Amino acid sequence: MPTILVQSYGFRQKMKTIFIPTALALLLAACSGNKVTETLKNEAYGNSEFYINKAEQSRNIEEQQSYRLLAVRKLIEENKVVEAQNTFSEILVAKLNDEQKLEHRLLIAQLAALQGNTEAQGVLRALPQTLLSQSQRLRVYQTQARIAENQNDVIAAVNARALMDSYMTDTQSRQANNDKIWEMLRNANRGMLEKAVAGPGEIGLAGWLALVVAYNQNMSNPAQLPQVIEMWKQQYPNHSAVLLLPIELRNVSSFQQTQLNGVALLLPLSGDAKILGEIIKRGFDDAKGTTTMQVQVFDTDSAPINDLLMQAKQQGAQTIIGPLLKPRVDEMLTSPEISNINVLALNSTPNVRAVAKVCYYGLSPEAEARSAAERFLKDGLQHAVVVAPNGDFGTRSAEAFAQRWRQLTNRDTDIRYYNQAFEVTSLLQGSGIGQGSGLYALGTAEQLSDLKQSLDNSPLANQFPIYTSSRSNSPNNGPDFRLTMEGVKFSEIPLLSDPSSSEYKKAEQIVESDFSMMRLYAMGSDTWSIANKFNEFRQIPGYKVHGLTGVLSAGPNCNIEREMNWLQYRGGSIVDAN
């Protein structure tokens, strides 16, 4: 019987893949030229290749035109700008009928918005609104949303997406739209949101603004959030988000505060990585202080991770902190022992995935690079250029920066890799870097010094701000280095940003001013802080803790992100750049 069921399911799947495109082809084949044109008012279910093929096969001019219009629409949805332009150029505008002309003008606006052209808004305003179908009105608001997103106008983008809801025909699309709205609002400036006011009739926008402001105001007290959301639902009972709450907020409704009972700390306490494990444990112990919480400590070099997890659970551990080394993290992720227990892994690997009750925290260059992209946006930069050394560190950092910059601005990053730092000047000449641009330069202190001197002796000197990472910050950097780096901004963890603090002095004494070890000490301290707010990080989007390694928050897959402090070299000294 099981075999029959499997065969039956496979047969249904096969028939489904055959039936849908076949039925679509039969439907369109049954249409006369006029009928095909009428489908312009409806949703297009084929892909661009399907409609291009239909246009090539048709001998009727009107059919050809309509199929090409449909093809352009799908190419825009597929973000294929060049192909959309090429297909658009094949349309004979003089031979379009009224229905085709309306679709043609809407596509002009959509394509312009995709390319970031400002003319898109004017084209939309000129459209005869009363002649638009429901599907076309949806695309008008989609285009308005894209225009607003191109201009980083969060309020206009949310308003357009709120208006889209009435014209969407399926629950999946409406849920995805609500999730996108919430993502934009969560990432927006809180002060701006509190001052924003919805216009007359903008009920959807008003509801969204009320929801995000109430959420932000109560985020520091997560236990109140379920009640806050229920009160909002009573105020806006007909709002789209009442029926389809953003997925991120669903966990909030069932939130329970972290109750830390029984911790197991898994670290390398023998072998080559012993020194790393010991300093992290010292930071953890100092943060824990006199708390009577029972903490079991396991050496990850003493036994397989699966065995250590079993032993920890048998001894009552409900939260696992560690392991630290990447191979051990991969080993842990394949263990059945991590089910139904909180796990804070102290590293991330390419195999990291979303696992219930698992978060990942570490001092990765990727997290610092993402923080740099956010700094670029905060400083009002429009164009991002990254120069990085060839190799693992450079590639990981550059790609992480580019990914975050794309998420924040919908723009690409110009990435250049170098073998020798003095090559950077020639790499940047002719790149278009200038006003409105920022350079994220990565490397060691020596590489950064060579790179900066090369730029200072070229026509590119003082043409754009330069940023770098903490990798170049070392206690061995003397006055000459600081003078060479004049004007350069760099990210650093809070612990190392304030040498006058008691935490800095304590860590400095423990590790004899070794910045690398001080960072690991700070990591150990923050590990204790994260464990104590584990549910908050996992379930409360945007929840933050101010730690010694940065302002900590949970990103995708519960990767703990770190918002860094920013310092600047000025007059031979290091000053606050915040």
From Swiss-Prot:
GO terms for molecular function: enzyme regulator activity. GO terms for biological process: peptidoglycan biosynthetic process; regulation of cell shape. A lipid is attached at C31 (N-palmitoyl cysteine). It is a lipid-anchor. Gene3D superfamilies: 1.25.40.650, 3.40.50.2300, Tetratricopeptide repeat domain (1.25.40.10). Coiled coil: none annotated. It is found in: Cell outer membrane. The keyword Membrane applies. Keywords: Cell outer membrane, Cell shape, Lipoprotein, Membrane, Palmitate, Peptidoglycan synthesis, Signal. Residues 1-30 form the signal peptide. A lipid is attached at C31 (S-diacylglycerol cysteine). GO terms for cellular component: periplasmic side of cell outer membrane. The keyword Membrane applies. CDD domains: PBP1_YraM_LppC_lipoprotein-like. Regulator of peptidoglycan synthesis that is essential for the function of penicillin-binding protein 1A (PBP1a). HAMAP family: LpoA. Interacts with PBP1a. This is Penicillin-binding protein activator LpoA. It comes from Glaesserella parasuis serovar 5 (strain SH0165) (Haemophilus parasuis). The gene is lpoA.
